[in-house]
Amino acid sequence: MIRALSCVIIVSFSAFSCTKPQPIPKNLVLAHVGDKTITIQDFIRRAEYSIRPAYCRQSNYVHKKIVLNSLIAEKLAALEMKKNEDELLASSHFKSFLKGRKEQAMRQVFYHDEFYDAVTIPDTEVQDHFAMAGRTIQVNYLNLPDIKTIQKILELSQDNVSLDSIFKSLWEGDVPTREIRWFDREPEVIHGQLFQKELKKGQLVGPFKTEDNTYLIMEVDGWIDRPALTGKDQKLRWNDVRERLTEKTARSHYMEYVENLMAGNKMELNPDVFDTYATLAADYYIKDDDEKKDALNQAIWDQIEQPDVKNFKVNPELDLTATLFTYNGETWTIQAFNDLLKSRPLVFRKRKMNKGEFPFQLRLAVADVLMDFEITQECYEAGIDRNWTIASNVDLWHDAYASKRYIDVKKPDRDGVESEKELLDFFNPVIDSLQGVYSDKIVINMDAFEDIELTATDMVVTQKGVPYPIMVPLFPIITTDNRLDYGSKSD
């Protein structure tokens, strides 16, 4: 599962010279539904990267057929929605959402093909890290505001005063602790100092300057080594270590590329306008835990269906024509920047922050938007938008939402069809009918289908640090049919 996440989409630049979108390779197609396609990867991701309902959650063959029927039903519903002039499907918000999904996928393809796939890690390097890969280190840590305070802590530590004692003398309670594993994605400077053979218990590590200009210092409290004992475990760890080292090297090369790409570019904020913008934005982006939970539950489609809920952008205190910043001498008004955010939402490097920290974090987030803007232009110039995987990803999200709209429009009484059972009781015969109507337009690769093995693990897969973190749409709850008695088999 880890490998599937790190290699989001696998493509080759060799075919980017064509002017039309590439066709999907035949051996990767699981089913054709009219002019729509379900790839083998689509099937696996939709089944494994989101939580399936109880009626198809297991790994047996019957449940696997329900999964396939559900994904085909989603495509059928999307085909039916072509007959309707649906306001939301035609909305600018939905088009911006699809554009954002497309461009995020393009950047991920660019990273994978140009950097990740270009790295080769020799066996000797894997061997050097193999034993340490089973280590989990327990650390005490302090996050302090300035280097002077750090120096005082270091002086006390030289007198054998522990971080725990220092913390208790300054604050109440115990010193903060955490576990750090070799596979954790810590900054390389921290990872390198912790995971070395010469490490000792009680050793101070750091200080490290953080992105918010504070300083982190750690004290090693101990560690546990978990060796890989069986041949199977050793092989798995060997491959995981190679993958982690590949990712580390690729990320380093990628950051060098980005640094060179952005060299010479200059962003200048308009202080008065930015301060007002940041104050209003903080009320929108800084939420309590309950609000964050609700936001996650509604995260996929709210951008389309409720674009102006709690939206600071329509606040009368903001003059949308005011200059928010200049970038390379070009003026960016609040309106122009907000238009860009419709397809590339802000992503904050720091997940938890107070309002005092927000303006600085907002500056970083704005800079990251402009960085992605530049990378995206490079991707378009390279022709990545014409790769079949990009179009397939856009179609996946389009059809998932079209299917949702079909359910919303088709069910007789929105308030009367509430439960999952009531919804399925209504739509099962509807989907059965559509299977018959479209039967001659449905072709299934049964050999590929038989080869797929599913797990019964509940999981929602997300990505960190990207505008659209949810990997795949929610699983479609539209049919419980477990028969494949329609369509035809591919050759």
Predicted regions and their residues:
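Sec-dependent N-terminal signal peptides
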Residues: 4-13
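C-terminal motif of bacterial Sec signal peptides marking the signal peptidase cleavage site
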Residues: 15-17
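Peptidyl-prolyl cis-trans isomerase
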Residues: 19-38, 57-491
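Residue-level detector of alpha-helical secondary structure
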Residues: 13, 42-49, 70, 80
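Acidic/histidine-rich, surface-exposed loop or edge segments in extracytoplasmic proteins
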Residues: 28, 46-54
